[in-house]
Amino acid sequence: MEEYEAQLLVVEQALENAADDAQRQDLLALKNNLQELLALTRESGDEAPIDELPQQGDNLDDELQRLKSELNDLEAAGSSQTALDEERQLADLRTKYTAMVGEKCSAPHEHSWGTCYHNALICGVDDEVVMNSEGVLDARLRVLFTNPTHREMLPCSYYLEGECRFDEAKCRFSHGALVTGSSIRKYNPPDFHKLSRSRPVFALLPDRLWHRGRVLCVNFVEQICRVRLDGQDHKERERDFKFEELYPLTTDQDEDDELSSEESNSSMNDNSSDEAESDMDDLEEARRARMVELSLFTFKPTERLGAWEEFTRGIGSKLMEKMGYIHGTGLGSDGRGIVTPVSAQILPQGRSLDACMELREAANGDKDYFSVERKLKRAQRRQRKADEKAYVRESQRVDVFTFLNDSVLGPGESTQQGEQVTKKAKTNELQQHSTKTLNVETVRIADEIRRKQRDMAKVKQSLDRNSGDAQLQKRLQVQMQSHKQELATLQAQERSLSKEQQTRKSKNKMFEF
């Protein structure tokens, strides 16, 4: 009797937990049979004859065995259903993670001081199944860190090529870290717009590891950043890095700025229009301060934008300044456009673009080959040379008044006589030297002439370069005149030596029979 009641309780509990309709029908039929059996047992009770007791006991035993077999079948069906659900869940997870292979993510890495997340690349799905902290089955992913900071995170180059002779436990480098799929996070791409002074960054060194440092200055035009590396083990602590060799780190200030921006947005929606205008003013001041800071770290050209308006009536730079442009920054709302103006170019008339490109390639790819500024400077140099030649021509020209002064008034005769006496004295002095001495003197004077011509070329370049400085032009003109006089003297000496050498050669030919 007690066994039947216990079995009835078990069947009722199974009915409460059963989800399948077929199982519920079987359990309900079994429950009805047990209730009928209990009712019959209570009615018959002690009235059953003695000879029927063994037969009734056999029926109860058979009923108990049948009940136990049905319970075992129900437990087996429930366990098989659970196993099927787990296999289906794992298959879905593997399909999901297999589709993620090749994608970038942020994966955890266990350091001595704790767990830290680093950017990584998913390269495969492990076969082993693990149980996460919440007691749910999960698969493990194999990831390679893209910004390794320690040697155990550095990917093995031989493993990537499939030639590593060591297994994962013996190799000093990483064959891929195993992390659970539920622990990965979204990939954090580098934001180079956040680069500013004292910003912490990771910098890539020749050892293929990313070392921590702080920004000293940034050149957004050439995309180069100077970083001071942390630690004392670097011989050159301050180095220049390209943007692709840097990874800006997120600071607490950035998180505070994001939170404050969200709070300011919510407050702007709740506050009045006056408060909204004040917030906009604050944002404008912050933007202007950032633009000024950007101008300090931007490449400075040799000439500021709009400097030519000093000599013209142009007002373009003034209008840009009225519209909010800050001198020293690039064009555009964020100040990251070009800093130097685009130079005007004039292409040859009647020539195709292909022909113009061929001309530029013939000039070794000179970008300023068709520049208007270069053509104007070339024309100025030609005009300057023509003016110099005209000045020399006019200075050497002898007019009527000079002829009368030199020939009629007398001092000219004495001057000519003095020059003739000087020439005769120099000729007599040259006749006293040997031919070898004359040859050595000729070589020395030729070297002096070449040196003097180089000096004159340098002075001429200085004149062209400093055309705007009047006082410097005067000093350079004096130097040029002095060099010209010395060059004329050297050339006269060279002519005298050449004449003497030619005279000696002629005499030698006359004495040969």
Curated annotation (Swiss-Prot):
Point to the regions of Low complexity compositional bias.
262-271
Which stretches are zinc fingers (C3H1-type)? 155-178
Q: Name one Pfam family in it.
A: G-patch
Please provide one cellular component term from the Gene Ontology annotations of this protein.
nucleus
GO MF annotation terms: DNA-binding transcription repressor activity, RNA polymerase II-specific; RNA polymerase II cis-regulatory region sequence-specific DNA binding; zinc ion binding
Question: Polar residues composition bias: which ranges?
Answer: 478-495
Role summary: Transcription repressor.
- Protein name as it appears in the record: Zinc finger CCCH-type with G patch domain-containing protein
The organism encoding this protein is Drosophila melanogaster
